[in-house]
């Protein structure tokens, strides 16, 4: 049981590393929290600091979710529910990082990393939803919200594991809730469109 609590703490601290803030500081760019949308995630980094840093932020944020879950699965004897808790801890770390006074990102990329480990097949379906919506309407937020809503259903049909379904439902609900401002902007027509 001690190893489980250590894994939870480690997952949270790894998830809390603010990839976008670190990368933009390393290249001498402005504080991402004070630029663009103010979000620390890959989309805002892409808009403010360019494609390269945006992609690196996406990869880094995804790895923050994937690595703790992979370690929990491959190097420990934790059960499915405990692995789900480790995944949730990494995700919460990104959304509420101790290093930034608990003001973090929306969790999409970190959730992606987690889901890629837990259910890669479901991710393919969710990515199709995301890509179609972004291609059609150019709203990353809309694609993210709808993909988050879809993935628990996809996990249910591809995995059928109650613990994994519960984990994805928990993470997806937070992702959607953390897009509340985007939802408001989508409704009033003021949301920023993605430009390649």
Swiss-Prot record:
UniProt membrane topology term: Multi-pass membrane protein
Catalytic activity: an acyl phosphate + sn-glycerol 3-phosphate = a 1-acyl-sn-glycero-3-phosphate + phosphate
GO molecular function: acyl-phosphate glycerol-3-phosphate acyltransferase activity
Record text on subunit structure and interactions: Probably interacts with PlsX.
Source species: Syntrophotalea carbinolica (strain DSM 2380 / NBRC 103641 / GraBd1) (Pelobacter carbinolicus)
The protein's enzyme class: transferase
Name of the protein: Glycerol-3-phosphate acyltransferase
Transmembrane segment boundaries: 4-24, 53-73, 78-98, 114-134, 140-160
Coarse class of the protein's main subcellular location: membrane
Pfam family, one: G3P_acyltransf
HAMAP family with a match to the protein in the record: PlsY (MF_01043)
Family: Belongs to the PlsY family.
InterPro entries: G3P_acylTferase_PlsY (IPR003811)
UniProt KW keywords: Cell inner membrane, Cell membrane, Lipid biosynthesis, Lipid metabolism, Membrane, Phospholipid biosynthesis, Phospholipid metabolism, Transferase, Transmembrane, Transmembrane helix
Gene label: plsY
């Amino acid at each position: 049981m001690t190893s489980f609590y250590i894994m939870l703490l480690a997952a949270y601290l790894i998830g809390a590393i603010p990839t976008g803030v670190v990368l933009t500081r390393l290249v001498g760019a402005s504080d991402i929290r004070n630029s663009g949308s103010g979000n620390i995630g890959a989309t805002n980094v892409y808009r403010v600091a360019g494609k390269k840093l945006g992609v690196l932020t996406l990869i880094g944020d995804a790895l923050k979710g994937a690595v703790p879950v992979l370690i929990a699965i491959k190097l420990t004897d934790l059960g499915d529910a405990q692995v789900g808790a480790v995944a949730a801890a990494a995700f919460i770390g990104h959304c509420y990082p101790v290093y930034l006074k608990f003001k973090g990102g929306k969790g999409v990329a970190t959730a992606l990393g987690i889901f890629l480990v837990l259910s890669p097949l479901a991710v393919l379906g969710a990515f199709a939803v995301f890509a179609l919506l972004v291609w059609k309407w150019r709203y990353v937020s809309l694609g993210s919200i709808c993909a988050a809503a879809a993935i628990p259903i996809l996990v249910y049909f591809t995995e059928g594991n109650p613990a994994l379904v519960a984990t994805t439902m928990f993470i997806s609900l937070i992702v959607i809730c953390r897009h509340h401002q985007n939802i408001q902007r989508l409704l009033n027509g003021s949301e920023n469109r993605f430009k390649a």
